[in-house]
């Protein structure tokens, strides 16, 4: 099966100078992929020429006359720029010409345009950015990582339901554990939104383990961590900054003297493994969960190496049937929730259900 993806080539801080080389490199290592490069045709072809890929059969150029800037208001992207590379790329997914869209564009605009073009799954008011973050024994699914800055309690409940369904579908876990990111484990901690969300989660049929703190994110304390997009995005980028700082410190220390440089040569295999594990670029690309089609959000600041990883996220998600599994799990969860007697102010669907086993890294986080 050929995996067909649309690439919003104009999105992000660097546009075609990053997205096109990443696409070229990706198709050269994945013969079953076809990428549709959407954007200003002359700019895309100029980059293809630089990459000596003008005749690459696995790449096609789809013209779009407008660009959603990183600082464009949502209403501009949604109402005025109807021929933007972002909108055209999503339209191709909606029409069935492609199976997923990858964009490094403006997060707010991408969420709004995706909701308008692709629509959300039943019972979901807002999509959320979800990603499988590494822990010592596997992965922790965390959402939202930036799609929704302000959330109501019922939105956090819906994020938990989507995270539950995704982990159940990918890993076959009947009752994935859920944690609510907070400033303390105690029930009395947090703002009113968090407290109310905790009440809804405790009243639901989810396997809610209570509040978790920032230092639990990489411990594997729970299978799914739920937070609003403001907190999630800050936590994610803080982690990336810390990883970069650690790598820089180690490099600096091993460069201090001739002896330390000799030690670095001896420790090179270990250092290379460490560098690979903490390189945040290989974790680029997260699913915009809750839509009827697949959308992968890349960091706007991604370089070509990082953006290639984002393309790989979409490719893996299609190959592993992530959307189909998630939709099936959400549908299976709906009936038990209807009988749970939840507070009328609650919303969404989730209950114990099992899906087909699959390694999360193979579905959303792998690279070959």
From Swiss-Prot:
InterPro entries in the record: FA_synthesis, Phospholipid_synth_PlsX-like
Reaction catalyzed: a fatty acyl-[ACP] + phosphate = an acyl phosphate + holo-[ACP]
NCBIfam families linked to this entry: plsX (TIGR00182)
Subunit-level organization: Homodimer. Probably interacts with PlsY.
GO molecular function, one term: phosphate:acyl-[acyl carrier protein] acyltransferase activity
Function noted in UniProt: Catalyzes the reversible formation of acyl-phosphate (acyl-PO(4)) from acyl-[acyl-carrier-protein] (acyl-ACP). This enzyme utilizes acyl-ACP as fatty acyl donor, but not acyl-CoA.
Protein name (Swiss-Prot/TrEMBL): Phosphate acyltransferase
Compartments reported by the entry: Cytoplasm
PANTHER family: FATTY ACID/PHOSPHOLIPID SYNTHESIS PROTEIN PLSX, PHOSPHATE ACYLTRANSFERASE
Keyword Transferase: yes
UniProt EC number: 2.3.1.274
